[in-house]
Amino acid sequence: MHPSTPISSLFSFTSPAVKRLLGWKQGDEEEKWAEKAVDSLVKKLKKKKGAMDELERALSCPGQPSKCVTIPRSLDGRLQVSHRKGLPHVIYCRVWRWPDLQSHHELKPLECCEFPFGSKQKEVCINPYHYRRVETPVLPPVLVPRHSEYNPQLSLLAKFRSASLHSEPLMPHNATYPDSFQQSLGPAPPSSPGHVFPQSPCPTSYPQSPGSPSESDSPYQHSDFRPVCYEEPLHWCSVAYYELNNRVGETFQASSRSVLIDGFTDPSNNRNRFCLGLLSNVNRNSTIENTRRHIGKGVHLYYVGGEVYAECVSDSSIFVQSRNCNYQHGFHPATVCKIPSGCSLKVFNNQLFAQLLAQLLAQSVHHGFEVVYELTKMCTIRMSFVKGWGAEYHRQDVTSTPCWIEIHLHGPLQWLDKVLTQMGSPHNPISSVS
């Protein structure tokens, strides 16, 4: 034996089956991790007749139909590979198809898959060609009226103000995921308390194109509208950290579609992490200190296919106030949703936002400036760690919670800004008392 040969190498052995499967591996990072992941899989598949052959067939002929390749589902649904836990279908899709895959939110099963991860059966399909990657939908441009053709009966401003004045609670309502969401079948009708947005179908076809049957019924022509397109910004969101009502540290600009906000310290300045443990505050009290110790792994934000997800990876719950999420589930706009450890919730949907914006523009014309401006509130998400706020807590407002963050969604905000610029000045000046 050569004196420099490590002892561990004498006992390391990669089976021919593992070597064969690694031949289809995508990317060149984390070789050892991929090898251990494949080795773990081979040991499971060897117990099932024909499973190895089916996997090799799927990998070697990606365009051809293939059967499910399954492994038993663990208690928490995750698989541990070399001190790292992950969902099995995500792990093997990362190994054999998409090395940059971050989350299960980026995957959708094909119709041919009988054991997709989301079905929660005893077996889980890990065939990477039984899943597809979620694509970001292209949002149609919204059409901004050029002229002031105000019809009081079409205006939503009065309804908006009436609902805001009479239905805004002294303290926000509370909801817990997933319990409060199980009866939710989508947005509530417009007459329900707190709902100030229209609920008519999205008018994606306005104004009518020339020659269409209903052209004579439409009061508008193409020249009456100016299209404003959605553009994806370089940084999809920014995150500001607060302790009570004090901003602490610099704002974090998120360029990666997967961002971890935790309570640890990471001096490497990783662009995918916002480490709250690094931030100092001379006014910090014992309650804040104790809360910061419980943030732990914090929250994982994913921006996938035009949707934003928040996954609680802390041992303690997180609390989220998202008007977009509340509208989608039929809650009051100010409702605070509790996300327990290990759960994830969709907190923003670009397509829903686009529909609301298009509806407001179509129905309220000139006097809808204030109503459209109100949509800026939907582009901000507030989230507290460990301690909640609202009607069920002694803290009435997010600024009473020890540790919280405010997330600004740049794409929707910039889109709104362009729309409002095209609309011109508001009928009533926007102010703190408007």
From Swiss-Prot:
This protein's UniProt keywords: Cytoplasm, DNA-binding, Metal-binding, Nucleus, Phosphoprotein, Transcription, Transcription regulation, Zinc
GO biological processes: anatomical structure morphogenesis; BMP signaling pathway; bone development; cartilage development; cell differentiation; hindbrain development; intracellular iron ion homeostasis; midbrain development
SUPFAM superfamilies, per the entry: SMAD MH1 domain, SMAD/FHA domain
S-adenosyl-L-methionine among keywords: no
Location, primary (coarse class): cytoplasm
InterPro entries: Dwarfin, MAD_homology1_Dwarfin-type, MAD_homology_MH1, SMAD-like_dom_sf, SMAD_dom_Dwarfin-type, SMAD_FHA_dom_sf, SMAD_MH1_sf
A GO-annotated cellular component: heteromeric SMAD protein complex
Role this protein plays: Transcriptional modulator activated by BMP (bone morphogenetic proteins) type 1 receptor kinase. SMAD9 is a receptor-regulated SMAD (R-SMAD). Has been shown to be activated by activin type I receptor-like kinase-2 (ALK-2) which stimulates heteromerization between SMAD9 and SMAD4. ALK-2 binds TGF-beta, activin and BMP.
Annotated family: Belongs to the dwarfin/SMAD family.
Quaternary assembly: Interaction with the co-SMAD SMAD4. Interacts with PEBP2-alpha subunit. Interacts with RANBP3L.
PANTHER family: MOTHERS AGAINST DECAPENTAPLEGIC HOMOLOG 9 (PTHR13703:SF41), SMAD (PTHR13703)
Protein name: Mothers against decapentaplegic homolog 9
Species in which this protein is naturally found: Rattus norvegicus
Gene name linked to the record: Smad9
